[in-house]
Amino acid sequence: MIDKAEIMDESAIMRAITRIAHEIIEKNKGVDNLALIGIQRRGVPLAKMIAEKIKGVEGKSVPVGILDITLYRDDLSMLSEHPIINGTQIDFPITDKKIVLVDDVLYTGRTVRAAIDALMDAGRPKMVQLAVLIDRGHRELPIRPDYVGKNVPTSRLEVVNVKLYEIDGVNCVTISDIEKGVRH
């Protein structure tokens, strides 16, 4: 898949992360009783980046968890006969906490629906909010993010690629055309 355009470079990503962190602090009137949970895979480094920015502003650490939604997806049978399970790691109680789910791209809303199902199996949060780096539209479910790094209108024939240093060795967001015969 060849990138046809870079829509965010590292500086733009960091500005968006900083803004999201400030918006989270403002909306929640601080960070007491707050936790971030990154959706595997690229939501995890984003959650860590947001937590670092929050710590820099508030002087308090916010717990960060990892949520694997693989077994909660409604397209599991289409993914693979043997899906790769990365594992959920939430080392703190989520019951009665304000949880901010973090993901890289919001598209149809199905990933977030699966994440909410997985989260509810882990406890009963006081509130669940959603932070995404990219909102590309095309929702199939009534899901709306609370915090957005950038709105990027796309066609269904395009794919948004978020590349993060922790996984990809570079921080940027690009758009590519979907290859014929490949379903995204």
UniProtKB/Swiss-Prot annotation:
GO biological process, one term: DNA-templated transcription termination
GO molecular function: RNA binding; uracil phosphoribosyltransferase activity
CDD domains tied to this protein: PRTases_typeI
Position of sequence motif PRPP-binding: 99-111
Enzyme Commission designation: 2.4.2.9
Lyase is among the record's keywords: no
Keywords: Glycosyltransferase, RNA-binding, Transcription, Transcription regulation, Transcription termination, Transferase
SUPFAM superfamilies recorded: PRTase-like
Reaction(s) catalysed by this chain's protein: UMP + diphosphate = 5-phospho-alpha-D-ribose 1-diphosphate + uracil
Domain of life, per lineage: Bacteria
Record InterPro entries: PRibTrfase_dom, PRTase-like, PyrR, PyrR_bifunctional
Summary of subunit composition and partner proteins: Homodimer and homohexamer; in equilibrium.
Entry's family note: Belongs to the purine/pyrimidine phosphoribosyltransferase family. PyrR subfamily.
Function description: Regulates transcriptional attenuation of the pyrimidine nucleotide (pyr) operon by binding in a uridine-dependent manner to specific sites on pyr mRNA. This disrupts an antiterminator hairpin in the RNA and favors formation of a downstream transcription terminator, leading to a reduced expression of downstream genes. Also displays a weak uracil phosphoribosyltransferase activity which is not physiologically significant.
Record-given protein name: Bifunctional protein PyrR
Organism: Acetivibrio thermocellus (strain ATCC 27405 / DSM 1237 / JCM 9322 / NBRC 103400 / NCIMB 10682 / NRRL B-4536 / VPI 7372)
